[in-house]
Amino acid sequence: CVVGIGAGMWDRLFDVPRPEYLHDFEALQGGKHSAPSTPGDLFFHLRASTLDMCFELARQIMRRLGPAVSTYDEVHAFRYLDNRDPLGFVDGTESPRGQAAVAAALINEGAWAGGSYIIEQKYVHNLTAWDSLSVEEQERVIGRTKLDDTQLPDDEQPTNSHVTMNTIEDADGNELQIVRDNLAFGEASGEQGTFFMSYAADPRVTELMLRRMFLGEPEGNYDRILDFSTPLTGCLFFAPPAAFLDDADQYARPSARPEAGPQDPTQPATELSAAKDLGFNASSEAPRDQTPDDHSN
């Protein structure tokens, strides 16, 4: 289980400054597509090999939190086939593994060493429109082949493919990485989509990828996948290292400590509530090979 804390919640709960890059998710408005900002207070990412284990842990968490929180979105997700998304393509192929994943996902020094920034977006797919494309057209949207998951050659890679928009480099030509832990979700008779989650030592990497996708690179040349996938949520959380959570009481504001007693019922929210769209998220799936063993999920 990973626990993420939103910017507003951090300010209300803790008497220490926010981690450097913790802020509300910034909405993006492109010429054709937009990414909404739906700030939340708490985010729980639960993983297990079976759904019942996730359900039981989620139930215990909610019992402990009680009336202090309101649940605004709970997504039960799953591993789909050989790590494919509902569009039929393998997801997370370029996500780093092993120590490279640790370096990309976890802050490696300073007061927040071992922590990570989480950005989540819940995408719903228009599968009717997607399935109307030929396989070759779909491959040009994604930038990879559908059957064997091979990246298209550079001279065939569209400038607006999903691969192109998510490939960014620093000034020295080194590719900047994040750890993706996307989940498929949906009902056969209803809504189907992908729950995007990125873990990063520096969320500005993910934010740059999203700006390229929605605003375009150059401007107007947006990620073609957005013609078929629409984000419903957008949140940024910070997952503190376990040691901080173990000693959270010593960092809490006086009003947030248990001995402070109940909050004034006339106030709009308790210290643990007021999440607008994603107060609690129970995501379940089988473990994936690309997730490093020492990166708790």
Q: Predicted regions span which residues?
A:
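Alpha-helical interaction segments
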Residues: 227, 268-270
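Generic alpha-helix initiation/capping and coil-helix boundary signal
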Residues: 51, 267-268
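Long, histidine/aromatic-enriched segments associated with O2/redox biology
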Residues: 1-259
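Serine residues within intrinsically disordered or low-complexity segments
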Residues: 255, 273, 283-284, 296
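Short, intrinsically disordered, low-complexity terminal/loop segments
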Residues: 65, 295-297
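A cross-taxon signal for low-complexity, glycine/charged-rich
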Residues: 260-263, 267, 276, 284-288, ...
